[in-house]
């Protein structure tokens, strides 16, 4: 997107004829139209590849549905949390919601792929764990919930037996981002879809962002529309529910994000961001809601955005330092997310030497429209019943 005022040559190159006295706003709109046209053409060229990819995924699912490819069902309660699309739908805070709901009644374990970790195979998190070893999201679980058994494994089917062998007292396993891992049949399948880009209005890769076709939603037991705006109306929720078209056995819920109390990365002391000037360092798929929140909360915000799950290199650290030091303003801090903090912490010696305040902003999930009790009861009922059967089985 170009924000400078274009001249006639620039417009001619874009195939537009506009008088020199036209407004900058009109030029910006014209440039947007050109970019949208280019994007549409490129996307259209990707459509044949989407058909091929979609056919492969469809065949894979049919093989599982027909029993040709086998799925393993474990006696221990297994809850899968995943999505149909690539990118951030908010799986991590929903996993944390389930941890907080279950951890005081049951021994909880999580199993993630450990995306972008520098290791392979099954790993049980211990005191040697860091984001490089187990991935940023599992490291976040490990740091926040010491009573939870945190594990990573690319292959859930072989990883779960190893997890249970290492921690036989586990009552329930939460599978992170496992909706497409059909080699394991979960007892409860939770599908999360983003409010801004629900699966029913999206298309399969690479034409759209779906990992598999829209009809795959039928495998879910619970469907959560995530990142809903605080002022979302019941009418809008009902409209989206109609578009989802849930099956008889499916329940649909809506969730929003609540930002929790910020704290210092090293001292863990609580911090108030109001009236502070913020350098936001984030590596998340959709940072816009976070930026919007900070612009409302803080005095001013400077954004440094990196790719999702990005590991900070020396040049990135220098960019953060220079941005902070060169911002000629007082009462300033660096703010990051909990997930990004696990990777920033790998550079803790350098960060401490700077003397720059690094503030972590946690987020929590909230179930909307007073449906939290219904959601909680559904989860607890399944786990309680399945865990009881698991305990009875282990006695014999």
Each predicted region: which residue ranges?
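Walker A (P-loop) phosphate-binding motif
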Residues: 62-127, 230, 396
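Residue-level signal for inorganic ion chemistry
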Residues: 52, 92, 141, 176, ...
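ATP-dependent carboxylate-amine ligase
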Residues: 24, 30-36, 184-191, 195-396
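Phosphate/Mg2+-binding loops and adjacent switch elements
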Residues: 114-248
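A transmembrane-helix-recognition feature enriched in membrane-embedded lipid enzymes
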Residues: 29-74, 371, 382, 390, ...
């Amino acid at each position: 997107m170009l924000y400078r005022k274009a001249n006639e040559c620039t417009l001619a190159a874009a195939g537009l004829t506009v008088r020199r006295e036209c407004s900058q706003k009109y030029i910006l709109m014209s440039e947007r139209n050109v970019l949208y046209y280019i994007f549409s053409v490129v996307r259209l060229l990707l459509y044949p590849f989407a058909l091929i990819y979609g056919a492969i995924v469809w065949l894979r699912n049919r093989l599982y549905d027909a029993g040709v490819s086998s799925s393993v069902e474990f006696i221990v309660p297994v809850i899968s949390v995943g999505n149909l699309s690539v990118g951030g739908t908010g799986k991590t805070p929903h996993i944390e919601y389930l941890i907080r709901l279950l951890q005081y009644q049951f021994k909880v374990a999580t199993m993630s792929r450990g995306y972008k970790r520098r290791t392979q195979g099954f790993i049980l998190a211990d005191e040697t764990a860091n984001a490089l070893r187990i991935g940023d999201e599992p490291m976040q679980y490990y740091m926040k919930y010491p009573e939870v058994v945190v594990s990573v494994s690319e292959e859930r089917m072989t990883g779960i037996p190893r997890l249970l062998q290492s921690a036989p007292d586990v009552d329930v396993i939460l599978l992170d981002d496992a909706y497409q891992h059909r080699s394991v049949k979960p007892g409860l399948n939770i599908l999360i879809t983003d409010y801004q880009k629900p699966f029913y209005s999206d298309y399969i890769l690479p034409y759209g962002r779906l990992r598999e076709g829209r009809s795959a939603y039928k495998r879910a037991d619970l469907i959560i529309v995530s990142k809903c705006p605080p002022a979302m109306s019941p009418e809008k929720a009902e409209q989206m529910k109609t578009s989802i078209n849930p099956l008889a056995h499916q329940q649909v819920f809506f969730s929003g994000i609540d930002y929790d109390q910020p704290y210092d990365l090293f001292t863990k002391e609580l911090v108030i961001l109001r009236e502070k000037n913020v350098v936001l360092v984030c590596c998340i798929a959709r940072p816009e809601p976070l930026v919007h929140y900070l612009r409302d909360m803080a005095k001013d915000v400077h954004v440094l955005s990196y790719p999702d799950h990005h590991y900070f290199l020396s040049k990135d650290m220098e960019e953060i330092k220079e941005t902070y030091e060169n911002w000629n303003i007082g009462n300033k801090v660096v703010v990051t997310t909990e997930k990004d903090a696990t990777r920033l912490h790998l550079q803790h010696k350098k960060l401490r030497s700077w003397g720059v305040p690094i503030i972590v902003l946690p987020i929590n999930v909230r179930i909307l429209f007073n449906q939290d009790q219904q959601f909680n009861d559904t989860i607890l009922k399944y786990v309680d019943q399945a865990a009881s059967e698991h305990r009875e089985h282990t006695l014999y």
